[in-house]
């Protein structure tokens, strides 16, 4: 089981997989857990090591982890069972070269989320979309939200980050553009730094 970093939802997925195996009485299965700690190079190394060790099944958590597993195990028939992947098709995890790959999507209906904004921010005029540019899952979610806004004449601004060090500045940039609400979709990097995100938003 491999996760790209630690935050509540990713940790919960890992722990639930392990507890369900235990509940099923599968104590014959050796479970190895790995965490790349938000390091892309480490993630690739972890996958290559698992391939060398000859694991029977790989369970990558989140989109970039699943993509890394696919690349590392190319040419192998090792089953890859992903979880927490927002858009498997956009992530390149479906198709003829993915016959050994399956899993569970955690896609968020972006239109419904945008509709909910008015529940806690009535009369808002402009949404600020913030996402990590390297996360396919996040880009896909935000693109769907922007499409809904375009169809419904909802104004928005957007900002992307390539590292968490850019997060406070990106938040301030959106606020300076007059947004009334901030929206981030399935974004593991930003989710792992939620206190930084909220502090930047509320400090204005």
Name each model-derived stretch.
Residues 82-110, 116:
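Ser/Thr/Gly-rich flexible loops in soluble cytosolic domains mediating phosphotransfer, phosphorylation
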Residues 136-203:
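Pocket-lining segment of extracytoplasmic ligand-binding domains
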Residues 14, 18, 44-47, 51, ...:
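Extracytoplasmic/secreted envelope proteins and their assembly/folding machinery
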Residues 33-95, 187-204:
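Beta-alpha junction/loop-to-helix N-cap segments that form part of ligand/metal-binding clefts
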Residues 17, 103-152:
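An alpha-beta-alpha
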Residues 18, 23-43, 100, 146-164:
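Short beta-strand elements in bilobed, periplasmic/extracellular small-molecule ligand-binding domains
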Residues 1-18, 24-26, 32-41, 134-138, ...:
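Extracytoplasmic "Venus flytrap"
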């Amino acid at each position: 089981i491999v996760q790209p970093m630690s935050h509540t939802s990713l940790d919960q997925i890992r722990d639930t997989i392990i507890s369900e195996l235990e509940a099923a009485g599968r104590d014959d299965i050796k479970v190895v857990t790995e965490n790349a700690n938000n390091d892309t190079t480490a993630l690739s190394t972890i996958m290559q090591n698992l391939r060398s060790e000859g694991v029977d099944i790989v369970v990558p958590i989140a989109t970039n982890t699943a993509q890394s597993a696919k690349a590392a195990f190319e040419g192998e028939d090792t089953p890859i069972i992903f979880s927490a992947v927002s858009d498997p098709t956009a992530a390149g995890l479906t198709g003829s070269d993915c016959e050994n790959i399956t899993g569970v999507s955690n896609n968020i209906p972006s239109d419904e989320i945008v509709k909910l904004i008015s529940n806690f921010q009535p009369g808002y005029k402009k949404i600020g979309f913030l996402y990590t540019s390297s996360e396919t899952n996040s880009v896909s979610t935000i693109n769907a939200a922007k499409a809904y806004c375009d169809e419904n004449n909802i104004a928005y601004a957007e900002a992307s980050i390539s590292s968490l060090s850019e997060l406070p500045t990106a938040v301030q940039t959106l606020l300076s553009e007059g947004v009334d609400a901030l929206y981030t979709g399935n974004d593991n990097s930003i989710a792992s730094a939620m206190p930084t995100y909220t502090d930047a938003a509320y400090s204005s």
